[in-house]
Each structure stands twice: as C-alpha cells, then as structure tokens.
A protein has these predicted regions:
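Conserved phosphotransfer microenvironments
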Residues: 63-80
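Two-component/phosphorelay signaling modules centered on CheY-like receiver
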Residues: 24-42
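Alpha4 helix (beta4-alpha4-beta5 surface) of REC/receiver domains from two-component response regulators
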Residues: 73-74, 97-113
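Hydrophobic/aromatic residues positioned on beta-strands within the core alpha/beta folds
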Residues: 93-94
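Acidic, metal-coordinating helix/loop segments flanking the phosphotransfer/catalytic sites
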Residues: 45-61, 69
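C-terminal output helix
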Residues: 119-128
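The C-terminal output helix
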Residues: 129-136
Length: 136
C-alpha cells in the first residue's frame, strides 16, 4: 500500500505503533502485547530504520528500546524537529538498566515515559493510558 508522506497509518481503524528493538524475540513479545492492546505494530530493528519510517509515515506511538541511548536521543530530536507543525508520535522508551540522568534527558527531549524491563501487559497498558494513546 503506497501512502503519501506524512499520512497517519490506520489499519482497520487501529492505532499504529512503531516498535524499535534490535532483538527479534523481544520485538515478537512486545508486538503480541501491543496488538493485544489494540495497536497495529510496525517493527524495525534500529533507530535509523525508525527515523526513515517516521519520515514516510506517521505512527501514533513509538515504543523503543533505549539501551543505546545516543541513538534514542538522536531519534527523539529528529522526530521532534521533523514534526514541528504536525502531530508528533508519542514515544515511550524502555531499557534493562537505564541511568536516571539518561531517563531525565530522554523525557526532556520529548519521550512521554520510560519503562524498566521486564514489564508486563498491565504496566504497558497503564503507561499508554497515561500518555493518552489508549483511553482510561
């Protein structure tokens, strides 16, 4: 399906989610969780691919593994810059062992929230509700 640049993706009226994680097993697990919450997932394995995806399409939410925080930081800055005048996707980051300074910087750079792994469906749903992606 060919879409015009900047078009928000909706599949059967589902919210779209860009999931970025290098680990295919983790992407599969999170896709199942996010799909169970009513989101249609597009998977990418790195920030560069995620940036290209966001340039071509406008997901409603981005859920991103942030262990390589320099890439996550660059991703947040580019998404913020490219979407100055349009709706930005909500970005939620997660990591195994985030340091508090990096978490704070990510929030300042535009991330809606930060999760510590491991997390379950209930916590993910709560964070998506808090960010305004899902209804309460």
């Amino acid at each position: 399906m060919q879409l015009a640049r900047g078009v928000h993706i909706r599949v059967n009226d589902m919210l779209s989610c860009l999931l970025i994680d290098k680990n295919p097993n983790e992407r599969r697990r999170l896709t199942q969780l996010l799909s169970g919450l009513g989101l249609f997932c597009h998977e990418r394995d790195g920030a560069e691919e995620g940036i290209r995806f966001c340039q071509e399409r406008k997901p409603d939410v981005v859920v991103m593994e942030a262990s390589g925080l320099p890439a996550a930081k660059e991703f947040l800055r580019l998404v913020r810059y490219q979407n100055r005048t349009t709706k930005r996707p909500v970005v939620i980051l997660y990591a195994d062992k985030p340091d508090l300074e990096a978490v704070g910087e990510s929030i300042m750079d535009g991330a809606a929230d930060f999760l510590m792994k491991p997390f379950d469906r209930d916590l993910l749903q709560f964070k998506l509700e808090q960010a305004g992606v899902l209804p309460h």
